[in-house]
Amino acid sequence: MESTFSSPAEAALQREAGVPGLFTPPEDLDRVYELERVTKFVCDLGCQRVALQFPDQLLGDAGAVAVRLEEVTGSKMFILGDTAYGSCCVDVLGAEQAGAEALVHFGPACLSPPASLLPITFVLGQRSVALELCAKAFEARNPDPTAPVVLLSEPACAHALEALATLLRPKYQDLLISSPALPLPVGSPSSQPEPLERFGRRFPLSPGRCLEEYGAFYVGGSQASSDPVLDPDLSRLLLGWTPGRPFISCCPDTGQTQDQGVQAGRLRARRLYLIERARDAHVVGLLAGTLGVAQHREALAHLRKLTEAAGKRSYVLALGRPTPAKLANFPEMDIFVLLACPLGALAPQPSGGFFRPILTPCELEAACNPAWPPPGLAPHLTHYAELLPGSPFYVPLPPPESELWDTPDVSLISGDLRPPPSWKSSSDTGCSALTPRPQLELAESSPAASFLSSRSWQGLEPRLGQTPVKEAVQGRRGIAIAYEDEGSG
């Protein structure tokens, strides 16, 4: 039975991976998993212990890949197949517990910078792409040969973008090819200008050009599941792409295309709704998601400062993977904010849903920072690192005397007038002394006390002075599942 506070330990062992036996033919292992490149990575580092991280859908090949690498490199391989939170993030903690000197991540990845300096390489996979069908679909959707278009893809199809561009370049002059933002080798030459990095991808823009000028042609997904809600990577692109610019998705197997403009509008509309919910909230639960991504401590401190500045109370909850059963134990929270990688924060919610909405840090920033967005720029960000100092999108909080804090606002959900937030120091107790009448009567206003008084059950009744005083006696011994006086029956 699932615990309401933590996932059972047996869940990882009893979960069906869905891929029995060998998934890839032995003769294709070298090509699919890029074993030659992985071998060079291990040999160049001289590692003796290497961790291999596989998602559930690739566990059928994990044993064969590990054996092949051990034979070629002579190093000891450890398979990490029980990632507790999200397989798209690098499991640095698991690799360190195994004593690994390097880590190889297989499968889809968010490509977020890890929190550790452990050497890491990524194998995104190589999904087959029908280049001729995709090229014809591109020409049908882009009749203007001078229109600026950027080629995007899911990580497993990135290997085919250059070949697709070769088929299109004789006709289209303004093509931009994106590539996964993989970690660059140490000491690699940097003679060319550094490309723009966004959405886990690199965009080699020409001088004077910006990404907002381009439309998008995305190769990925499938005909059966074209809903971007089911694909966090596509949702990230749709949220962040410039509104009004075309965004076309293409199935790599059939070449069937779909205009994602309507889906992008739905995602942005939901984000605006969540921002309104955050503005109405008084108590915020900060969910500490994956701890293997860089700057998660700085982001957590930033979110706490943000909620304090907006006059809201925040509580940090470390619950692992969020589930409706876990979060239902905290009815005091008005909203939850998930601090995770972009793919983890935009992952689809389980069936049944949560009783309180789960937001991303970017939505909380838009709700609590009155200076957001910066003038002339309204990006739909998806990664919390873009909110921190050093990012081009960082917007500092206005000073306490700024008029931005005194601007009245009306809730678009309830229709009530929201009072202007007040800047509260960390030493504030959360209660305000009010003197509404000259009788000098003292009244305390506390959000926590107001919520407690509205609950149907407020805890055990103290009954002070109503029960006799007794000497303390020994109570029951054992644990809740089996006390000593209950026997084994």
UniProtKB/Swiss-Prot annotation:
It comes from the Eukaryota. Pathway: Protein modification; peptidyl-diphthamide biosynthesis. The modification Phosphothreonine is found at residues 435, 467. Disulfide bonds: none annotated. Its cofactor is [4Fe-4S] cluster. [4Fe-4S] cluster binds at residues 89, 110, 341. The modification N-acetylmethionine is found at residue 1. Keywords: Acetylation, Iron, Iron-sulfur, Metal-binding, Phosphoprotein. Pfam families: Diphthamide_syn. The keyword Chaperone does not apply. One of its GO terms (cellular component) is 2-(3-amino-3-carboxypropyl)histidine synthase complex. InterPro entries: DHP2 (IPR010014), DPH1/DPH2 (IPR016435), DPH1/DPH2_1 (IPR042263), DPH1/DPH2_3 (IPR042265). Component of the 2-(3-amino-3-carboxypropyl)histidine synthase complex composed of DPH1, DPH2, DPH3 and a NADH-dependent reductase. Interacts with DPH1. This is 2-(3-amino-3-carboxypropyl)histidine synthase subunit 2. It comes from Cricetulus griseus.
